[in-house]
Every structure is written in C-alpha cells, then in structure tokens.
Curated annotation (Swiss-Prot):
Protein task: May function as an androgen-independent transactivator of the prostate-specific antigen (PSA) promoter. Binds to 5'-GGAT-3' DNA sequences. May play a role in the regulation of the prostate gland and/or prostate cancer development. Acts as a transcriptional activator for SERPINB5 promoter.
Family the UniProt entry places it in: Belongs to the ETS family.
Cleavable signal peptide: none
GO process terms (BP): cell differentiation; epithelial cell fate commitment; glandular epithelial cell development; intestinal epithelial cell development; lung goblet cell differentiation; negative regulation of cell fate commitment; negative regulation of transcription by RNA polymerase II; positive regulation of apoptotic process
Source organism per UniProt: Homo sapiens
Name assigned to this protein: SAM pointed domain-containing Ets transcription factor
Length: 335
C-alpha cells in the first residue's frame, strides 16, 4: 500500500536485529568482543536480560570474569561486591583477667601468676637497659655512677646531660654549689621548690641513679652484707657475704643493712630506738622497691614485703613494739 520508510532500506538487515546502542559501541568494546571470539568461538555472552541494564554494565561485568582473582585493583561491576566474602575479623589477643579468683589464675614456678611473671620479665629488661644508659653517661661525663660521690662540678655535668637527654628546662642555676650528698638528701618537694617546671622529673632520674649505684655495690665482688652467725634469731654486726655459704639474704638482714646506712637510706627507714631495736619505715614504697631490686623481683610492692615481715612475728625475729604504731617494728634481739 505505501512505500517503505525512506531511511529503512539503507539500514543493514543485521542491524535491525540488534539493540540500538550496539551500533555505537566503542572501539574498546569491539576489540574485547573480538578477542573473546578468538578464544572461545563456541560461546558468546548473552545480552542484558532487562532494558534497565545497559550494555556498558553488561560488558564491565563480563570483563570482570576475565581478570585473575588477585587483581583487586581492577574495576568491579555494580553488585560485584555482594559476591565477595566478608573480611575476616583480626585475631584478638588473649586478655588476662587480673580480677579473676585466685584459683582460676595460671601459676608459674615461684607461685607468681602469669601476669605478674610477665610483668617482672619486662621490668627486668627495662632495668637492664637503664643500667646500660647510666654506664654510657658515666663514660661520656667522666663521673662516677654513685651520685653520693659527685662534686659540685659533677652535679652540674649530670644536670646538663639530663636536661639534654629528656628535654628539660635549664635547671643548673637552681642547684649551684650543691655536691652529690646534698643533692641526694633533698626530697622531691625540695626539687620542685627549686625548679617548679622540671624538679619532680629530675628527682625521679636522680633516684634511678641512686638505685643503680646501690645495685652495683650489692653485686660487686667485694660487697659485704650482714648475715646470721648461727641462726636467724641470733644475728650480729659481723660483716660477711650475703650469700652466707650459699644461702640467700633474708629480709630482716636487708632491713638491717638499710638501717646501718642512714646517710643513704635514712629517708626510707630509720631507727627510733637503736638500743631496743625499734625502727620505722618512713617510705614503704621505696623500701619495697629496694628489696625488689635486691631479690631481682621488680614487681615487689609493700603488700608483699609486709607479709614477709609479719611472718617474722611467729619466728621471734621481729615484732610490734609495746606501743603499736603504723610502720614501726622492733627486732626481738636488738643490736
């Protein structure tokens, strides 16, 4: 009846069977389609199932199948992420419950919990590194490791080095003309009064040096200690090696060592009545720390130390004086 549409006869019949946007495919899509045809001539991808899915998404999805699995940088088709497996959760470190009942904690040799044992190992490593640093500083500054032996010029050297190492404000003028003994006799509060900005930190570092010197003295071949001559109950002033023929030093012997050196440890422990053997622990934390250093137990605290002291009540070595006071004790057999 009517003639065909003017433009219809000029269109290839094969184009009539394809979707409109196939004609406008890019060169990249044609090349990809050709490559696929060479590799697998017996199979070709199906066109989009629905009109809403464009050919661009279709070809991207198809190209995604050609990439190796480890090409995580390659572009993924919309919805491809839904096929991915959920990421694995990072492995959690075991948590030690320090509040758990005593019966539920794992114990290591020595009666310590696993947590305490690990803490002591770490602290021992830290102490070792600190001692190395102090030894290095002594060589650089040409000073002794014991602050008690420092001259005023040695004190100034140590102050400059500590300020530089730990980025502290200049404090040399605040401690001029002070020798090592005078510096060691000062309290933390006195350090703060002389240097409000860094006095407390400086006092802490000096305390580390004093402890290190004390450790070195105790472990040196010529170190002398006080031990029982016959039994724990009958101790004397004789100076003998702390090993006592292979036996470790006892706490009461250690306390006596501190008491007999008031110039070094008078701030921590002192005699109230030496003739009667009455003494007072002024700084329980420091005494416990020194005892921990001696026994190589960095996690030592006063709770543990006081339990050991109370055990001496039954053995007749230490007791509470007639007028009971906090942190005041009496040797049953005075000097």
């Amino acid at each position: 009846m009517g003639s065909a549409s003017p433009g219809l006869s000029s269109v290839s019949p094969s184009h009539l069977l394809l979707p409109p946007d196939t004609v406008s495919r890019t060169g990249l899509e044609k090349a990809a389609a050709g490559a696929v045809g060479l590799e697998r001539r017996d199979w070709s991808p199906s066109p989009p199932a629905t009109p809403e899915q464009g050919l661009s998404a279709f070809y991207l999805s198809y190209f995604d199948m050609l990439y190796p699995e480890d090409s995580s940088w390659a572009a993924k088709a919309p919805g491809a992420s839904s096929r991915e497996e959920p990421p694995e959760e990072p492995e959690q470190c075991p948590v030690i419950d320090s509040q758990a009942p005593a019966g539920s904690l794992d114990l290591v040799p020595g009666g310590l919990t696993l947590e305490e044992h690990s803490l002591e190992q770490v602290q021992s490593m830290v102490v070792g590194e600190v001692l190395k640093d102090i030894e290095t500083a002594c060589k650089l500054l040409n000073i002794t490791a014991d602050p008690m032996d420092w001259s005023p010029s040695n004190v100034q050297k140590w102050l400059l080095w500590t300020e530089h190492q730990y980025r502290l404000p200049p404090m040399g003028k605040a401690f001029q003309e002070l020798a090592g003994k005078e510096l060691c006799a000062m309290s933390e509060e006195q350090f703060r009064q002389r240097s409000p900005l860094g006095g407390d930190v400086l006092h802490a570092h000096l305390d580390i040096w004093k402890s290190a010197a004390w450790m070195k003295e105790r472990t040196s071949p010529g170190a002398i200690h006080y031990c029982a001559s016959t039994s724990e109950e009958s101790w004397t002033d004789s100076e003998v090696d702390s090993s006592c023929s292979g036996q470790p030093i006892h706490l009461w012997q250690f306390l006596k060592e501190l008491l007999l050196k008031p110039h070094s440890y008078g701030r921590f422990i002192r005699w109230l009545n030496k003739e009667k053997g009455i003494f007072k622990i002024e700084d329980s934390a420091q005494v416990a720390r020194l005892w921990g250093i001696r026994k190589n137990r960095p996690a030592m605290n006063y709770d543990k130390l006081s339990r050991s002291i109370r055990q001496y009540y039954k053995k007749g070595i230490i007791r509470k004086p007639d007028i009971s006071q906090r942190l005041v004790y009496q040797f049953v057999h005075p000097i």
